[in-house]
Amino acid sequence: MGLRPAKIDRDVDKPAYTRREYIRGAPGPKITIFDMGNLSAEFQYEVSLHAEQAMQIRQNALEAIRIQVNRYLQKNVGRSNYHFKIRVYPFQVLRENPMATGRKADRYGNGMRRPFGKPIGLAARVKKDQKILTVWVNEGHLKFALEAMRRAAMKLPYSAYYRIYDKEGNDITSKVLSTMKR
């Protein structure tokens, strides 16, 4: 069975389903690396991607974001000139009630009898305005970090926005963007 469309799992409409000790056959996380780049250096700017609304991000999308952003930054900035961190973890267990289709499906299918479903994957639950991922860079590489965030936002189920912070944590997005456009 193939991967279902992401629009099925993107809404936060069901209660949290995370207690793995009660779930038989819960899959393991596909994403295992959450910090990439130069982890020990200090950088001038922090660029973070925030969720515009509450959503669930499947682990496949998180892994795709991780690979894409890390590859883009390594190629354009260099491994020692950035620190990239994914700030969410896929705890939510997704489940599916497999429906039998085809000839004589009524003989061996259960339909809606006991429809709770079997675990098929994991997702990260994100609240409105929560940071999803962060890149720390210096001033010369800020435009590459913004492009990486734009590319990462395309892989999310709902829209997202980025914010730029200085070392003290002050939001300086409008100030930095106004100087970059000149």
UniProtKB/Swiss-Prot annotation:
Keywords attached to this Swiss-Prot or TrEMBL record, sorted alphabetically, are: Ribonucleoprotein, Ribosomal protein
Which cellular component terms (GO) are annotated to the entry?
A: ribonucleoprotein complex; ribosome
Q: Which GO terms describe its biological process?
A: translation
Disulfide linkages recorded for this protein, renumbered to the chain, are none
Q: What is the lineage of its organism?
A: Archaea, Methanobacteriati, Methanobacteriota, Thermococci, Thermococcales
Q: Which family does it belong to?
A: Belongs to the universal ribosomal protein uL16 family.
Protein name (database record): Large ribosomal subunit protein uL16
Which first-to-last residue range defines the signal peptide?
Answer: none
Q: Which GO terms describe its molecular function?
A: structural constituent of ribosome
